[in-house]
């Protein structure tokens, strides 16, 4: 067993662990930061993210809006200083519905999100003196409005989003939203953290020593040895392994994992244009299986999830640059 010392041990080298190490070492000058993970950085769940962001949160209070406004400020600063290495865009989130009741709820939620600090709600009904609508660019984030545009005027809706279902009655385009390359962001922060002295150990945290109710050391098992790191601070950024790490401290954490399904499909018909924003369908729906497909799906172990009513909130965005024709489709079905 080899012995080392550090100011802090961070357990988990996903985006949360890397950003923690980056903040401590790069922004706050902390030295002797250890980042431990049995897998290479950004390879468990962080590289499988939607990679999207939004400040549009209609409750239950203003906590998420304040958190995300600050987070987006930080992202913009990093994009500026790195020449947008992680390709952050400001295409926005477009919430859509064919339900008039849901359309009214979207307006009420928009008023609420605006009151929490997400920016003004601009309502487009086609009346004289109404607000102007500024389409979002496909790249970049500078010079874009915040808040949201609620489009109820049919002609503007069809002109701006001709690819949406003809049944669509309302569109809420939240503006301080978009996506970026999470992998590139993680690698950028990791490079800067390492340059500031952060040590990455590819190993599993196997034991956490406490003295007087305080962390005193951490044992990390690598392929070749066990490393004991004397450190008074231990940060858990273990993602889906959170309960396992908690058990090392004798703590049963009341958390669960939620299965988010991400499907990549080739849009060979070009249904969704490559400059489209992040699209969310707010209504429940059924998938239009043929009789043959329905019979096949019914034989799958969880086939009933796909044959019944799909929950609201299924969303999609384009994936890849250049000549890519792929879409990402994301939905949440069950807890595991």
Where are these regions (language model features)?
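Active-site substrate-recognition segment that forms the wall
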Residues: 22-26, 38, 49-55, 83-92, ...
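A short, basic/flexible loop-to-alpha-helix module at the beginning of a structural domain
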Residues: 1-5
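Dinucleotide-binding Rossmann-like beta1-alpha1 core, especially the glycine-rich loop
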Residues: 51-155, 311-314
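Conserved Rossmann-like nucleotide-cofactor binding loop
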Residues: 16, 41, 241
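Conserved catalytic-core motifs of eukaryotic protein kinase domains, centered on the activation segment
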Residues: 45-47
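Helical element adjacent to the flavin cofactor pocket in flavoenzyme catalytic cores
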Residues: 165, 172-233
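N-terminal Rossmann-like FAD-binding beta1-loop-alpha1 element of flavoenzymes
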Residues: 6-34
């Amino acid at each position: 067993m080899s012995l080392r010392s550090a100011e802090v041990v961070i357990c988990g080298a996903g985006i949360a662990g890397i950003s923690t190490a980056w903040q401590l070492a790069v922004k706050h000058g902390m030295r002797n930061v250890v980042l431990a993970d049995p897998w290479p950085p950004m390879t468990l769940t962080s590289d499988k993210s939607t990679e999207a962001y939004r400040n549009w949160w209609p409750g239950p209070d203003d906590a998420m809006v304040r958190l995300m406004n600050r987070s987006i400020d930080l992202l913009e600063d990093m994009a500026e200083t790195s020449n947008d290495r992680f390709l952050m865009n400001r295409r926005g989130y477009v919430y859509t519905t064919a339900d008039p009741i849901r359309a009214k709820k979207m307006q009420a939620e928009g008023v609420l999100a605006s009151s929490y600090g997400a920016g003004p709600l601009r309502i487009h009904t086609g009346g004289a003196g109404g607000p102007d609508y500024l389409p979002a660019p496909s790249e970049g984030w500078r010079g874009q409005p915040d808040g949201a545009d609620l489009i109820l005027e049919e002609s503007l809706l069809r002109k701006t989003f001709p690819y949406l279902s003809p049944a669509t009655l309302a569109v809420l385009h939240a503006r301080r939203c978009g996506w970026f390359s999470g992998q590139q962001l993680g690698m950028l922060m990791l490079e800067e953290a390492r340059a500031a002295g952060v040590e990455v150990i590819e190993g599993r945290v196997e034991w956490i020593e406490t003295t007087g109710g305080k962390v005193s050391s951490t044992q990390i098992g690598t392929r070749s040895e066990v490393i004991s790191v004397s450190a008074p601070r231990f940060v858990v950024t273990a993602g889906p392994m959170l309960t396992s790490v908690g058990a090392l401290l004798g703590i049963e954490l009341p958390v669960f994992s939620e299965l988010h399904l991400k499907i990549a499909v080739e849009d060979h018909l070009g249904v969704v244009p490559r400059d489209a924003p992040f699209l969310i369908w707010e209504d429940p729906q059924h998938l239009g299986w043929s009789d043959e497909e329905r019979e096949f799906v019914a034989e799958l172990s969880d086939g009933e999830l796909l044959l019944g009513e799909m929950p609201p909130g299924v969303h999609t965005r384009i994936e890849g640059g250049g000549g890519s024709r792929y879409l990402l489709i994301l939905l949440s079905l069950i807890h595991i």
